Regions:
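Selective transmembrane helix interface/packing segments
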Residues: 1-357
Length: 357
């Protein structure tokens, strides 16, 4: 199991590339083919499933190492990756709703349609980072949680766990985990490029010309966009400090997941309105306007609570109740320790007894 764990981690990070389109239709040795190994109707679901398999490589590494640091690191990593996979999956649901497919190639093609504002063709590609900004932001945040990179590298933080779940590894298995980490970073960047940045399609305003937006040019655009996301990974590592573990988990469960659920409901409702043609019904628009005004009024007036009502009175606190000292909580008051003297008091008493010597 100890030797199998890094192999599982390495295979999981490479498998996702089989369904990521690197380019469109190209001519190769007299044959026309796509720059993609395979495309299945549930390609994005396959990517999420493979990412979940990578967690087993981390858990098995910590369990088989028989070390405290390794076990704690693997538990942290598994909890972190599972928590942020939920928010990541919810952020991708809106992409499925807009594109109408889970196929990676069809999602890229759906982003090639131009944005039309008031009947005017802007010639700007409808990339989902622009149409689905909340989903894009949530995916970028969860991307760091999935890759265990700063500011979310809590399973490997040197100040607490030495090297985390890879503390007991050396040589080739140790290098395999580092390879898996950086390949996973490239995989997440490629998925971000495919689902939100238009994939192999040329960016605006280069998409005006069909010459540089087809054939082998797609490989260049895909590579440049992926490198841009990888650069963002490196920049964040150098610019943002590490999160505390409880803050990190609160961000995932109390912020990202509720926001993702609310955003999915909003997008689904909006698409239903467009498909049913309710947007041209004045009665429907009036009802929606009244509901929005009521929500805004409730948020600014009725949603406020009295902060003083939740404050509990100060309570006495025994720091040694569990057998070892623990710090008091904000609403607890630590009782004075009987017979305890500080080092300064003892030194002053000895100084007085010796006559100032």
């Amino acid at each position: 199991v100890f030797n199998l764990a890094p192999v599982i981690a390495g295979i999981a990070c490479f498998a996702s590339w089989s369904v990521i389109p690197l380019g469109g239709q190209v001519s190769m040795f007299g044959h026309t083919t796509r720059l993609q190994i395979t495309d299945v109707p549930v390609a994005v679901l396959f990517i999420l499933a493979v990412a979940s398999i990578g967690i087993y490589g981390v858990v098995l590494a910590g369990w088989s190492s028989a070390g405290t640091y390794s076990l704690l690191g693997s538990l942290r990593s598994s909890a972190q990756m599972i928590s942020y996979e939920v928010a990541m999956g919810l952020s991708l649901v809106t992409v499925f709703i807009f594109s109408g497919s889970m196929s990676t190639s069809q999602i890229v093609e759906s982003q090639a349609n131009h944005l039309v504002v008031g009947g005017f063709d802007t010639h700007i590609a409808g990339h989902y980072w622009l149409l689905l900004i909340p989903s894009f932001v949530i995916y970028v945040i969860t991307m760091f949680g999935e890759s265990n990179r700063l500011p979310f590298d809590l399973p490997e933080c040197e100040s607490e766990l030495v090297s985390g779940y890879i503390t007991e590894y050396s040589g080739f298995p140790y290098g395999m985990y580092f390879l898996a980490e950086y390949i996973n970073m490239a995989t997440l960047s490629a998925v971000c490029t495919t689902l939100f940045l238009g994939g192999y399609r040329a960016p605006w305003p280069l998409n005006y010309s069909g010459v540089i937006d087809s054939g082998w040019w797609g490989l260049l655009w895909f590579f440049l966009k992926t490198q841009l996301v990888i650069f963002f990974f490196v920049w964040v590592r150098a610019a943002i400090p590490r999160f505390r573990y409880d803050h990190f988990m609160d961000l995932g469960w109390k912020v990202l997941i509720p926001v993702s659920l609310g955003w999915v409901l909003m997008v689904a409702a909006w698409r239903t309105v467009i498909n049913q043609g309710w947007g041209r019904n004045p009665v429907f628009l009036v009802v929606v306007g009244v509901i929005l005004v009521a929500l805004i009024v409730w948020a600014f007036m009725g949603g406020k609570t009295d902060s003083t009502a939740d404050e509990a009175p100060d309570e006495p606190f025994d720091a040694f109740a569990g057998g070892y000292p623990v710090p008091p909580l904000p609403h607890q008051v630590q009782a004075p320790l009987a017979g305890a003297a500080t080092a300064t008091t003892v030194a002053r008493r000895d100084h007085d007894e010796n006559g100032g010597l």
